[in-house]
Regions:
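Mature catalytic core of soluble alpha/beta enzymes
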Residues: 1-157
Length: 157
């Protein structure tokens, strides 16, 4: 993704929107001369809204990892496709989705995947102080309510 972006920029393209497999890389502005507006999918089953929230991007990348699309259902239990590297077993987490903004797709995708296997508290501790990473979490609490948390500058350009 980042190679495609750089290749197009070298050839004079200024306003770019590239999406491959859920990773997004934007440059410049949309056709109305404004920042690109990207929808973050709702991880809530049977939700009336398919978009949970939107974020504006300018000259940045966005990647989202979630447990709501790729899972195995066995005996009424959803088994997450994210694997804990320490145990080799599927992660059990209340985190439903993590979206990461970064200056490139490589970092955004890697951090979205890494944060997906951590709790919110573990994840926010890992990325605090990293200026190039902003993140947005969607998770469920112990009562099944859907909540969101995000870093200070996630919604800023």
């Amino acid at each position: 993704m980042d190679l495609i972006y750089r290749w197009l920029k070298k050839r004079g393209f200024k306003d770019l929107f590239i999406e491959i497999g859920g990773e997004i890389r934007c440059g410049g502005f949309n056709k109305m001369g404004k920042d690109w507006v990207i929808g973050i999918d709702s991880p809530v089953e049977n939700s009336r809204q398919s978009i949970f929230t939107t974020v504006q991007l300018r000259n940045t990348a966005l990647a989202t990892s979630g447990n709501y699309r790729n899972y195995l259902e066995r005996e009424g239990q959803k088994i997450n496709h994210s694997i804990n590297p320490n145990t080799g077993k599927p992660v059990k987490t209340n985190v439903l989705s993590v979206s990461v903004k970064s200056e490139n797709c490589l970092n955004a995708d890697a951090w979205a995947t890494a944060l997906m296997i951590m709790t919110y508290d573990e994840g926010i501790e890992k990325i605090n102080g990293l200026d190039e990473i902003e993140a947005f979490w969607i998770f469920s609490d112990t009562n099944g309510n859907i909540n969101q948390r995000y870093t200070e500058n996630f919604f800023n350009n």
